[in-house]
């Protein structure tokens, strides 16, 4: 299994219930063929540059280990989710 780091930014006005639903959805995708090692919610932060006329976003960092198919499925779901304004999945070299 490979180790990955996922960072995603949600719209800052997303309520806590919706944030938790999305986190559980993404966690479920990962745990289907992997394991979540750490979830770190950074909260609302100023964006480095304006995205879709927004200056703030809710940052979440997830470290996980999985097969190579999971990041592809996760990427597909992150692109579909309306509340996600940006995301990035990188493989961590050991």
From Swiss-Prot:
Bridged cysteine pairs (disulfide): none
A Pfam match: Ribosomal_S6
Any one annotated GO CC term: ribosome
UniProt keywords, alphabetically: Ribonucleoprotein, Ribosomal protein, RNA-binding, rRNA-binding
Biological process annotations from GO: translation
Molecular functions (GO terms): small ribosomal subunit rRNA binding; structural constituent of ribosome
Matches recorded under Gene3D superfamilies: 3.30.70.60
UniProt record similarity statement: Belongs to the bacterial ribosomal protein bS6 family.
Role according to the record: Binds together with bS18 to 16S ribosomal RNA.
Record protein name field: Small ribosomal subunit protein bS6
Organism: Alkaliphilus metalliredigens (strain QYMF)
Gene (name only): rpsF
């Amino acid at each position: 299994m490979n180790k990955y780091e996922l960072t995603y930014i949600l719209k800052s006005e997303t309520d806590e219930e919706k944030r938790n639903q999305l986190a559980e959805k993404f966690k479920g995708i990962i745990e289907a063929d992997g394991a979540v090692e750490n979830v770190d919610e950074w909260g609302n932060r100023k964006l480095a540059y304006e995205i879709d006329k927004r200056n703030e976003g809710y940052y979440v960092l997830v470290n996980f280990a999985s097969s190579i198919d999971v990041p592809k499925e996760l990427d597909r779901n992150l692109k579909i989710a309306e509340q996600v304004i940006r995301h990035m999945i990188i493989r961590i070299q050991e």
